[in-house]
Regions:
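Conserved, structured core segments of small domains
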Residues: 1-116
């Protein structure tokens, strides 16, 4: 089995739209979204290598020093699957973007380190 890093992507526009929802509607969506996310985790437990977590603010370290930056990454999970396609299919209809205001999930293979 190969390992894949899945990054949850969100946009400021989607979050702003979410925040404009009526509080009662938003709370109902949060409750159903949390349940759906837990159900997704249970259904895919055999594929999940690392449950991951939400991500906080970003710092960039470079030859120019350390700076604050913004990106669209909101969380991650590591899964295992036979192929890149199979890993991506795990996230079809994921609550991150079907219930919550997430934009998408980007999935990339974790490649082995080169060397002896």
């Amino acid at each position: 089995m190969k390992k894949f890093l899945a990054i949850y992507i969100g946009t400021e526009a989607a979050l702003a739209k979410w925040k404009k929802l009526d509080e009662q509607k938003r709370k109902a969506l949060e409750a159903s979204g949390i349940k759906a996310w837990m159900d997704w985790g249970t259904a895919n437990a055999a594929a999940i290598v690392d449950q991951g977590s939400p991500l906080g603010k970003t710092k960039r370290a470079s030859a120019r020093g350390v700076s604050d930056i913004k990106n669209a990454m909101t969380g991650y999970v590591i899964v295992q699957a036979e192929s890149h396609e199979a890993a991506a299919r795990l996230f079809e209809s994921h609550p991150h973007f079907t219930i919550f205001p997430g934009d998408s999930v980007e999935i990339m293979e974790c490649l082995p380190l080169p060397g002896p």
